[in-house]
Amino acid sequence: MTLLCRLLKQLPTSEHSAEELDNLLAGKLGFLSFTTEVMTQPDVDGVRPYLLVSAGALSEKIDALASLPREVWSSTLLLDADADRVRDVLTQIRIGLEQGFINNGHSAALGRAMSYSSPSAVVCEQLSGVDFYLFLRDLLDHFDERLEGLRTKLAELAGRIFVSDGCLASFTGSDEDFDAYWDAAGDLGLDAGDGAGAGRDALVVPTPCDRHEAFVIPSDICFAASACDPRRLGLDVTGAWAVAANALSYDYLWNEIRVKGGAYGCGFRAAGERQTAFYTYRDPAIDPSIERVARAGEWLGSFEPDEAAFEGFIVSCVSGMDAPVKPYALTKRRNTTYLAGLDPHAREERRAQMLAATPGELRSLGADVTRIAAESPTCVFGGREVIAKSNAGFNVVDLLG
C-alpha cells in the first residue's frame, strides 16, 4: 500500500503523461498527497489503517480539486508502469529510509520499540518502518523478476481501496466552497466495491513480541528508545504526565545523559494516553544511558523544584497546546480524534490537568515511571562498535546489508 501511495502522481494516467500531470497538479492545486495512517483504538489491541488522500486548492479552482485527485486514483496506468520509473521511485524511497535511520535513528527506534508490544505499531512498521525497508530492499534486489507481479498487485490494490464502501470524506472551507466541491465531485467516481469492507474487517496483524534488536548503521554513535502503550501497564496518562515529561527531559535526563553522558539529545515522552517512551539521540554509549533511564522514576519521586522552574514546565506544556494552527491542521487533528476513537473533550481536560499539576502529583508518578523504564521494550540503532560494547544482550541486525 505504501508503494501504491508513492507511485501515484509519479506515473501517467489515461488522460495525461506524467509530465503533463505534474504540471497540472502544480498549477491547479496547492498540494496533493497519498499517505498511509494507522490509528490506535480504545481497545489496546485495536488497529485501523487508512489510506489518506489529501488535497488543497484556491476557491476558484474547486473543479480541479474535485477532478485531479480522482483522475490520479482512478486512471493511473499501474499495469503499464514504466520499469525504469518504478525502479527510480523505489530507489529514492530506499535512500530516504536509510538516511532517516542514520540521521534520525531515535524516531526509527521509537517506532520499532513500540512495535514490540503494540499491534498498531506493528502495522506502522510494515507500512513505513524497518519491516517496510526490508521488504523494499528485497524487492529492488529481485526487481526484474518481480516487476510484473508488482504491477498486478498495485492495480488490484487500487481497485479494492478506491471504492465508496468504507470511504470517509472531510472538507475544510466555506459553505459556498463545500457546495461547489460536492456539485463538481459527485460520488467521487467511486464504485460500491465487492467485499472491500469484509477485507478491511478481516485484517490480521502479527502478534507483537519483544525482539530486543540493535540495528547496525554506519555511525560511531547510537540512538536508543524504550517505548510502550501505558494501557498495557494499566496506567492512566493524564495531563500531569506531560509536565513530568518536561521535568524529566529538561532536568534529570538532560543532566545525566546529555551533560554527563555526552549524548546530543534525550527525553521522555508521554504522548496523549497511548504512548510513553524514553529515547536518546546521538549517544556515544548504550548501557550507561539505560542505567540512567532506570533511575528516572527515583529522581521524580523526590522531585522538589522551585516555584519558578515548576511554572516554566507547566507553561511550556500548555503553550504547546495553545499554539495557533491553520484550519487544515485543525481538521487533521479532529479527524484523528474521530478515527482513533478519542474523547473529543480529552484535549481540554488534559490542558486543565497540566495547569492543575503540582510537584506532589509529579512525585506520585515516580513509581510508575520506574515501572515504564523497567517494562518497556528497547530498540537501538547504532554503529557496530558501540553496539558491541553493550552488555544488554541485543539481537544484532545488519540493517543496511
Feature-to-residue mapping (PLM):
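In a subset of proteins, long, contiguous C-terminal domains/tails are tracked
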Residues: 356-401
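Hydrophobic, Leu/Ile/Phe/Ala-enriched alpha-helical segments that form helix-helix packing faces
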Residues: 7-8, 25, 29, 73, ...
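M16 family metallopeptidases and their MPP-like homologs
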Residues: 1-144, 164-173, 223-243, 253-359, ...
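Generic recognition of flexible, low-complexity loop/linker segments
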Residues: 152-160, 166-168, 212-214, 253-254, ...
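An aromatic/glycine/proline-enriched structural segment found at the starts
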Residues: 168-225, 232, 386-401
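Short linear interaction motifs
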Residues: 145-153
